[in-house]
Amino acid sequence: SLKTSIKTITYLSDTGCLEIQGASLVGQQYSTGWFGDNAGGENYMQFSDMYVTTKGFLPFAPEADFWVGKHGAPKIEIQMLDWKTQRTDAAAGVGLENWKVGPGKIDIALVREDVDDYDRSLQNKQQINTNTIDLRYKDIPLWDKATLMVSGRYVTANESASEKDNQDNNGYYDWKDTWMFGTSLTQKFDKGGFNEFSFLVANNSIASNFGRYAGASPFTTFNGRYYGDHTGGTAVRLTSQGEAYIGDHFIVANAIVYSFGNDIYSYETDAHSDFESIRAVVRPAYIWDQYNQTGVELGYFTQQNKDANSNKFNESGYKTTLFHTFKVNTSMLTSRPEIRFYATYIKALENELDGFTFEDNKDDQFAVGAQAEIWW
């Protein structure tokens, strides 16, 4: 998809400003709105944010960013796994960021988003409105170069009588409120680099997404579809990610995630499932200079689900990647843009959850390519 960005700043006083930030026109209902009407999707563009943010307008929080529009609380990503530990989809709402309270800062967002609630055939759907509160108390100093964040998120639905009737009488899945709470500690190092440790616990549909073997961001839906018999089951996630410099010419990045859940709805093994998973990636590299690095990335994952009948299903695999990157700075995780040339071997050891195979029914693949990563 194509994303464009606009930003207009108007200073209204010596201490206050107003900014309009976003990505062109967006809808107010779904978080992933499309612009265009080509049924084949070729002329579609997808947009995320469109909001107005102000600073200096609130007497009780003059330093805070006060926003209104289609936006959400900042996302926190496990970069080498390409999914999030903290994510609330952009939606119509209001929020504050970087509000100084005591030793730390508060981020708070109140947003509404429509989701598609499906029936048990997964063929029919109804649109229901959800409301989310996302609250974080961050940048709490602990010791030298260490900070703490405490976070909470709660999602509830504002359902009409007809929507509830469809759930009671026409086979649509019941909406169940869902929450996620946690904490994270970030330690920065004297020579540069950092490590972030986090603990998260969630229930119902967010817990179901903890249990996904891929794309395990804390969503409330599965690819935009809400379904499943959620029974209050919970899941826990422990993560570590960061990077460290070793001497003048070496850097190592890491990402480790351990998750487990009990009595959750699994999108692979259905209701009353338990799961346990481990994902680990390490990426050492040699720093030639500020603009060049050569390294290897080693990754492994394993997951076991147990369904309501105690049947066990296993998914596991590994990959090895050799790469050379052109960069703007030496940090692996915080410097962009970068261009990477790579050769990757990936092997599926077990695939009882998804049954995936590569071309010609193979369980492995070798690929050579180039990619660019850009943030804006």
Segments (PLM) and residue ranges:
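Glutamine-centered polar micro-motif within alpha-helical contexts
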Residues: 1-27
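Leucine-rich solenoid repeat modules
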Residues: 316-339, 343-353, 357-360
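Extracellular loop and loop/strand-boundary signature of outer-membrane beta-barrel proteins
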Residues: 35-38, 78-83, 116-124, 160-172, ...
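Residues that flank catalytic or metal-binding motifs in active/ligand-binding sites
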Residues: 46-48, 64, 90-92, 129-133, ...
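Outer-membrane beta-barrel "beta-signal"
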Residues: 322, 362-376
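Outer-membrane beta-barrel pore domains and translocons
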Residues: 28-31, 69-73, 111-115, 153-157, ...
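Outer membrane beta-barrel
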Residues: 21-118, 130-147, 151, 343-348
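Detector for outer-membrane/organellar transmembrane beta-barrel domains
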Residues: 135-159, 164-307, 316-322, 326, ...
